[in-house]
C-alpha cells in the first residue's frame, strides 16, 4: 500500500461515550475462518455484555467478509461492523490501524478487545498510541466492576 492510498487520521484522545454500552471485538481470521482467539473473545465479550446490559460488536476488516460475519453472529455477536475494502485484503498494520481507529472514534465503544496474537499485539499497541488511551496486555481474565464502571484485567505475574 502506497502512502497516497493510506487512510490517515490525526492522533486523537479517545473518550468513551458513557451512554454507549458496547463491547467491541477485533475479529482476526485466516483463510475465511475466524481465528480461535476471536471466538474466545466473542464468548468473553458475550458474558461481560450479559452482566452489564451491553451489546457485543465484532469488527471485521478486510475483503469478502460476509461469511465471517455470519460465523461471528453464531458465536455471540449482536452486530458486525465490516470495513470491506480491496486495499485491506491482506493484513497491513498501518492500514488496519487507520481503519479501526476511524471506526472506534466514530462509535466510541466502552471496551475494545483484541487477541494477543502477533498481528493483534501490533495493532493494539498502535491503536493505544493513536487514540491516546490505555492498553491492558496479555490478560488471562476480564471482569467488570459495574459500581465503578471499570474493566478489571487479570494478568499472570512472575517473580
What are these regions (language model features)?
Residues 1-159:
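N-terminal glycine-rich FAD/FM-binding segment characteristic of electron-transfer flavoproteins
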Amino acid at each position: 500500500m502506497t502512502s497516497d492510498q493510506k487512510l490517515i487520521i490525526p492522533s486523537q484522545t479517545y473518550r468513551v461515550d458513557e451512554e454507549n454500552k458496547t463491547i467491541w471485538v477485533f475479529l482476526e481470521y485466516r483463510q475465511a475462518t475466524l481465528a480461535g482467539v476471536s471466538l474466545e473473545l466473542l464468548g468473553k465479550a458475550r458474558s461481560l455484555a450479559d452482566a452489564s446490559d451491553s451489546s457485543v460488536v465484532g469488527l471485521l476488516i478486510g475483503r469478502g467478509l460476509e461469511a465471517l460475519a455470519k460465523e461471528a453472529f453464531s458465536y455471540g455477536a449482536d452486530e458486525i461492523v465490516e470495513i470491506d475494502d480491496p486495499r485491506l485484503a491482506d493484513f497491513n498494520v498501518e492500514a488496519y490501524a487507520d481503519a479501526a481507529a476511524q471506526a472506534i472514534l466514530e462509535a466510541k465503544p466502552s471496551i475494545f478487545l483484541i487477541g494477543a496474537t502477533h498481528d493483534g499485539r501490533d495493532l493494539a499497541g498502535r491503536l493505544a498510541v493513536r487514540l491516546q488511551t490505555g492498553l491492558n496486555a496479555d490478560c488471562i481474565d476480564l471482569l467488570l466492576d459495574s459500581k465503578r464502571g471499570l474493566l478489571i484485567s487479570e494478568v499472570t505475574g512472575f517473580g
